[in-house]
Amino acid sequence: MYVRTYYHNNLPGVTSLPHDSLPPAAPERLETLGWNLWMLSGDDIEKQAAEIAERVGYTRPTDKINVLASETIESAGTVEEKVKMTAKLQASKEHYTATTSSVVLIVDGKGHYDIEDPIENMWIRVILTPGVLMHIPGGAHTRITFENPEGYLDVLMWFNVCIYVHKSINPSY
């Protein structure tokens, strides 16, 4: 099994349509942009995802977050609200800039996740299905779309845990 990715054809119209008329995006291209994708399978995808997330430095998972295509949040304060805000932004065909890097597991649902390729000036579309695990770099421009208004995604996210190191301050500077 693999994660399906391809270049969005950028034709006018509804961004939630497949827009699949250009070649696949090579995994090496995504890695160049700071992305890593995995396709997990089996009954233990959450455990597999946690092991991968920890291996790449992400140790703090969230609870499951439900993202609805019809989401209408006015302001985003919590992690869950920020994730849901991406669904709201997709309705206006705008992109969302990831402020911090994270690892995201699709637990249930289906959608499209568009990644900006600033070098090619195009969008790369990732087909989101259960088992897709993504490492999202901070600063990435993305957008999420659903095929229909009833679309949803259940996701788990991991973030870096900040480690503070106490240093003595030398007052003689």
Predicted regions, residues:
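Double-stranded beta-helix
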Residues: 143-173
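Conserved short histidine dyad/triad with adjacent acidic residue
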Residues: 64-99
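Beta-strand cores of modular interaction/reader domains in eukaryotic scaffold and signaling proteins
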Residues: 105, 114, 127, 135, ...
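Short, conserved beta-strand element in jelly-roll/cupin
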Residues: 96-117
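A short secondary-structure junction signal
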Residues: 115-118, 123-124, 146-147, 167-169
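Conserved metal-binding segment of the jelly-roll/cupin
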Residues: 127-148
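N-terminal leader/capping segments at the start of a protein or of a new domain
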Residues: 1-70
